[in-house]
Amino acid sequence: MKHNRIFRRRSYRLSALRASLRDVTPTARQWGFPFAMRIQPKLLSTFTLVNVVDDEGYYLVGRIALLVDAVLQGRLPRRLVSHGNYIGFNFRITVQHRRKDAPEILELEAVIGPCDGRRLAAYVWLIEPPSDPPF
């Protein structure tokens, strides 16, 4: 069927992935981060730094950029995991839910690459805790 051809195109299949990781590269570069950065939109829309009024996520992006930079420079010891041309690590950040008063500690995962030097990008997303088993 002709109308199904669009689903076979590579660009159409990747559009959902592109929408799930918002490009915050200009903001990260203002904080001195050297790579392109993409952060899960749920993280930016739901959380902010503790005791900071941050409507657009500017300070949250800056804090994440500083943490990732500290891990790469060795100032924040973390175990780096190789994913082929990419390296990844987990880290924690203290944030506050936009609609709650209590601070929370979130577990985030960052993957940086490709490590061959072309168009480096850092991808950051929230690690969801496992849900309770249904039984």
Identify the role of each PLM range:
Residues M1, P134-F135:
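Intrinsically disordered, low-complexity and often Lys/Arg-enriched segments
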Residues M1-R63:
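N-terminal "domain-start" segment
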Residues N51-P134:
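Functional cores of ribonucleases/endoribonucleases
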